[in-house]
């Protein structure tokens, strides 16, 4: 299951009433236990001994009891990629209104009535995967998905839906409504990619997208590139693949601000987008470095470390920069360049060691794109 294109699907289920609890159980049973990480029920719905006993004996999900939605939703919002509420839509709207950040950052939000007759993908229908979750859960529990997104209603696949399938980002987001409106009005979008690889059959055979040659690039409404020009016409968006890996070396106790600053300056030197980052990579001696961990959280990318012996092997094989100071401190000739290369599958170093405030940064480019789309259905 990979609805968000990144493999990090985790769900929280929240219900208010006795009947809502029964519906929530049906949903929970239709999903793999690993993805439903939290299961909440209002304390009043557990007033009967039967409900309480059933909740404690559920082999898949341990019920957690709450008194007020406002006490749990802010944390769930930050920690889960999918939130499923079994309650009135108005209640959910009022609870989440102050938490909204943007369609590229908000979780998928679905709302069901307590009898499980209707499923509404309320928020993040495309980039968050709420629409496909609604459709597939409707099939599983015998409900009706209520989809209101214009492109979906007309049977069109919007560019941000393709972005979700591949785990790509959209820039600039404020151009997306204009481009989607063009798709609705014209029935077709022009697309150009700076990469030589061809996309998967589903996209190639989508009659609503016309792939352009280099000479017709200026006619594009969608460009696939990790190096977007954001001074662009409002009927153009970039789909940004995460193909730049950032290697970071640092002094102990470096601040998160210094790490973010160093990474940002390095990306700016390349004319790339922060959304093109696949992760922050370093040596395993830095696996507990708070500045690196928090910077990765802020940028919403993985943080991964490698053993020093692996870094040294890359340094020697690729003839990378060597530092006597680093060698004396941690036993390897360098960190950032080798770590950035190890963060790719078949990459090349495109920005050698760059020095910031207490950090060194290097960037490698993945030489191949993965066009394997996410599944159209849930494996449940």
Set out the residue ranges of the language-model regions.
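N-terminal beta-loop-helix "entrance" segment that forms/cooperates
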Residues: 35-75, 289-290, 314-320
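C-terminal non-catalytic interaction/assembly regions of soluble proteins
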Residues: 276-277, 281-340, 344-351, 355-359, ...
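Extreme N-terminal starter segment of soluble prokaryotic enzymes
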Residues: 7-13
């Amino acid at each position: 299951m990979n609805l968000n294109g990144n493999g990090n699907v985790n769900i929280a289920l929240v219900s208010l009433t006795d009947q809502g609890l029964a519906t929530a159980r049906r949903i929970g049973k239709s999903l793999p236990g690993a993805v439903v990480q939290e299961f909440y029920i209002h304390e009043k719905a557990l007033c009967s001994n039967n409900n309480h006993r059933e909740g404690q004996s559920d082999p898949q999900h341990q019920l957690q009891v709450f008194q007020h939605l406002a006490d749990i939703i802010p944390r769930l919002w930050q920690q889960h990629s999918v939130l499923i509420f079994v309650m009135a839509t108005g209640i959910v709207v009022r609870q989440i209104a102050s938490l909204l950040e943007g369609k590229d950052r908000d979780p998928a939000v679905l709302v069901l009535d307590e009898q499980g007759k209707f499923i509404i993908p309320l928020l993040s229908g495309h980039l968050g995967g709420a629409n496909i979750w609604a459709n597939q859960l409707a099939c599983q529990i015998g409900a009706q998905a209520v989809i209101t997104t214009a492109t979906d209603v007309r049977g069109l696949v919007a560019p941000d839906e393709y972005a979700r399938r591949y785990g790509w980002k959209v820039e600039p987001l404020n151009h997306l409504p204009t481009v989607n409106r063009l798709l609705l009005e014209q029935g077709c979008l022009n697309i150009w990619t700076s990469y030589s690889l061809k996309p998967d059959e589903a996209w190639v055979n989508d009659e609503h997208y016309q792939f352009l040659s280099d000479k017709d690039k200026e006619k594009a409404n969608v460009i696939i590139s990790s190096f977007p020009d954001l001074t662009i016409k409002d009927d153009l968006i970039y789909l940004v693949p995460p193909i730049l890996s950032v290697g970071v070396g640092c002094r102990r106790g470096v601040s998160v601000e210094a790490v973010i600053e160093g990474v940002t300056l390095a990306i700016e030197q390349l004319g790339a987008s922060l959304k093109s980052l696949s992760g922050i990579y370093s040596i395993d001696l830095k696996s507990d470095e708070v500045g690196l961990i928090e910077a990765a959280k802020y940028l919403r990318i993985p943080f991964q470390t490698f053993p020093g012996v692996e870094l040294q092997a890359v340094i020697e094989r690729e003839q990378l920069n060597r530092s006597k100071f680093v060698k004396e401190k941690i036993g390897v000739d360098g960190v950032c360049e080798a770590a950035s290369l190890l963060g790719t599958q078949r990459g090349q170093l495109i920005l050698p060691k760059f020095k910031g405030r207490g950090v060194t940064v290097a960037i490698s480019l993945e030489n191949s794109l993965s066009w394997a789309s996410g599944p159209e259905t849930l494996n449940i």
